[in-house]
Amino acid sequence: MKRVVLAAVTVSVIFLIAACSVTTNTTNDHKNMNDNKTLQTETATTPLKVEKGPEVTLIAKEEKQKLSNGVIVPVWTFNGSSPGPEIRVKKGEKVKVTLKNELSAPVSIHWHGYPVPNNMDGIPGVTQDAVEPGKSFTYEFEANVPGTYWYHSHQDSVNQLDRGLYGALIVEDTKEKYDKDYTLLLDEWVTDKEEIKKQLKEMTKGQIGNKSKGDENTKKNDDKNGMDHSGMDMGSDQKDSGNMAGMDHGNMKMEGHDMSMYDLFTINGKSGDLVVPLKVNKGDKVRLRLVNAGYLSHDIHVHGHDIKVIATDGQPINNPKVIKDKVISIAPGERYDIEFTANNPGKWYVEDHSKNKGAKGMKAVIEYDGSKEMKDKADEKGKLAKLDMTKYGAKKLGSFTLNQEYTATYNMDLNTQMNENEVVYTINGKVFPDIDPIQVKKGDLVKVKLVNRSKMDDHPMHLHGHFFQVLSKDGKPIEGSPIVKDTLNLKPGEEYEVAFVADNPGEWMFHCHDLHHASAGMVTEVNYTDYKSDYVPNQNIPNKPE
């Protein structure tokens, strides 16, 4: 079994935001950036770029991008913008995406939510080596599962995703017909110059090249550059773990762990007046695909219309019911598909409800043909009820039941703890790579109980290569439609049981998609004991899966 040792990162480093230097380049990562490059200053009439597959080339390169009026930042992009192009393919097509790296650092592409073959999953040090500057790599898979997915770099992903290396992947079902079909990628950025300077200064500390577990140099590298996670056991049930056990960061002074530093929110890489209107005609059947590519949850409210949530994480909801004036809470990594009929002419907001000042910019406008004056009122601080997905849609028998017989059962206790003034995020009291993997064989039926024991942190847990069915929440069976997902958010104190079939052999990550948490330990693996990979990590490449 191959494992990759994650970087042990200081708290300040964990929260660096390299994407967001407003006026100057102060890091080695951008030392080759040409300040005279063309600025990406699209107007509000420029749509999200779409690449219709099945063969696509993505070029990773540095650019500057106008996020809002007066805010231009250096970004890392696919094909010159963040987000990168929306890749649209049809069910049944054989997809071929060639990644060319023109950046100064290695990159990769992970197909978030889509069950690709293991060697196409894009995890440096686990399924492939990161693609070095000047090199290329081709990803190939069949698009057999329609839905809303997305792609992003999984090399040093806590930073590269923040820098802008992501885009949407849409697998179209040819039987579904919509007059308008829009994808909205949600993200957050930092614009405060002093905060940016502090973050960028901290970037140079504690950076560790992650090596495979068998590398003899790993320990030496860790000792020189930062804390070594290996051998650390902080199980809250162990008496000898001392003050480390159960110590939640909410009770600690932790510099930089203030997510309000993300003060500018974007939709498709734009904020405020630069967000592209969603143009419709009266009578249109409209689909909105909402993708959270950021690190904060967003409570999205569609004004002026009765809507249905028809899918979550690309998987359909059974007989969804009409709702109005409720927010849909979308956690990092999650996707929600919304459908409505355009039957209320005018201009209407689609907005985030949040106390964070960045929410002012996370607004799109549903704009009917011929409409002129905006009469709708923005209300990002208004309190609305949240849609409870555990009771939404019509109940029916899913692939699994709560009390059926399972081949394997596992528990995952998620926590925020301290070790020698370092914040770490643990599963069963340990950090990766010392967390025991979930071991399966092809065909196994697997049930996992997840409990969030952190006092203040959400943990959006993402399983690679598989879909799971949500069976229960806080001990109560799901009352509505079967819920099938690949990313599930656990708020403090919450408990879920999920089940999946081991039908995609490989070595798969199961981790928190607040990548700050993943980079500080909250990662495990689902390993097939009857699978053997041909991949051997190149020890000369600094593979950093988180």
Protein language model annotation of sequence segments:
Residues 29-30, 59-174, 297-328, 348-360, ...:
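Histidine- and aromatic-enriched segments that form or immediately flank copper-ligand environments
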Residues 45-47, 83-88, 274-279, 399, ...:
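Short beta-strand segments of immunoglobulin-like
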Residues 120-123, 127-132, 142, 186, ...:
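Histidine- and aromatic-rich segments of cupredoxin/plastocyanin-like copper-binding domains
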Residues 1-5, 10-11:
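Positively charged n-region of N-terminal signal peptides that target proteins for export
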Residues 16-19:
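C-terminal motif of bacterial Sec signal peptides marking the signal peptidase cleavage site
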Residues 183-282, 291, 417, 425-428:
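Acidic-aromatic/histidine active-site loop/patch
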Residues 21-24:
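Bacterial signal peptide processing site
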Residues 179-210, 380-409, 420, 542-546:
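Compositionally biased low-complexity segments at domain edges in trafficked proteins
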